[in-house]
């Protein structure tokens, strides 16, 4: 009974802390006349504006406030989960997995915050902040290898953006073989997919109208993160056949690293 009670309490605490939206708080301070929910993008040869579907997080806030404030918001989003995770993992319950529930529900709160009519961000900063506490080595290895595999082997910006997160499932399975870690990794991936549904629906609609390419190009120019990812994609494409070679090497290296993680508790 105590276990269930602590799981519920950990989840509630994580959710309410995660629901704090620094993007909305700072936007209200710096640009009170602006709204993250009403951001529009004007397409060429079209009288209508398209609503920008990026959630209400650091990336979208950076379009209005600038890159510097976008970075600050991203850091604050990381800190808001890092602090309670450290408290739960290392001080309150060092031998229990309650911190994983704080992390998972912190992400749910960030993406669907109760304070803001369940309109939140997409949780990239929250996921990174949580994983730094849960397994910092997983962040370093999977972000690097995920980007290399996504850009070099698959040649896709979308895969590169999310592959590192998908890789957390086999990583936790091989390294810990603990049901709590595995459930956390699966749940985080499900949350990430569900939070992208508005973007997916918009992309399908724009693709039917033949406006998807222009929307992507204009949206990419609006944020430093997207511009950086686009530059990385262009760089890897410029490598030609060497991109595939680098991708295969990255895949082999990934298999070796994961094998070491499983056999020697890396």
Residues covered by each model-derived region:
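Loop-to-transmembrane alpha-helix initiation sites
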Residues: 140, 144, 157-165, 175-190
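Multi-pass membrane catalytic core of lipid/isoprenoid biosynthesis enzymes
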Residues: 52-89
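Helix-coil boundary and interhelical linker segments in multi-pass alpha-helical membrane proteins
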Residues: 1-13, 85-101, 132-139, 172-184, ...
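Interfacial segments of multi-pass membrane proteins
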Residues: 62-65, 88-91, 124-154, 166-175
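Alpha-helical transmembrane segments in multi-pass membrane proteins
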Residues: 10, 14-15, 19, 23, ...
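Cytosolic, membrane-interface loops and tails of multi-pass inner-membrane proteins
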Residues: 25-67, 204-237
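N-terminal signal-anchor transmembrane alpha helix
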Residues: 2-34, 254-258
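Final/C-terminal transmembrane alpha-helix of multipass membrane proteins
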Residues: 240-262
């Amino acid at each position: 009974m105590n276990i269930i009670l602590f799981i519920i309490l950990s989840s509630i605490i994580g959710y309410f802390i995660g629901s704090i939206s620094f993007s909305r708080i700072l936007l209200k301070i710096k640009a009170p006349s602006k709204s993250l929910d009403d951001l529009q993008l004007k397409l060429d040869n079209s009288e209508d504006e398209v609503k920008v579907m990026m959630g209400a997080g650091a990336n979208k806030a950076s379009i209005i406030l600038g890159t510097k404030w976008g970075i600050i918001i991203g850091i604050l989003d990381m800190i808001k989960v890092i602090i309670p995770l450290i408290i739960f993992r290392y001080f309150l319950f060092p031998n229990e997995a309650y911190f994983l529930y704080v992390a998972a529900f912190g992400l749910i709160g960030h993406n669907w915050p109760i304070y803001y009519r369940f309109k939140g961000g997409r949780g990239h900063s929250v996921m990174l902040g949580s994983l730094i506490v849960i397994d910092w080595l997983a962040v370093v290895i999977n972000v690097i290898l995920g980007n290399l595999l996504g850009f070099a082997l698959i040649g896709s910006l979308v895969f590169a953006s999310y592959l590192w997160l998908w890789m957390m499932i086999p990583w936790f399975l091989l390294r810990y073989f603990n049901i709590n870690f595995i459930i956390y990794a699966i749940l985080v991936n499900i949350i990430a997919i569900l939070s992208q549904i508005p973007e997916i629906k918009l992309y399908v609609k724009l693709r039917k109208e033949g406006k998807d390419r222009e929307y992507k190009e204009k949206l990419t120019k609006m944020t430093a993160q997207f511009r950086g990812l686009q530059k990385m994609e262009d760089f890897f494409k410029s490598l030609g056949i060497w991109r595939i070679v680098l991708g295969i090497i990255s895949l082999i290296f990934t298999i070796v690293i994961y094998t070491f993680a499983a056999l020697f508790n890396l």
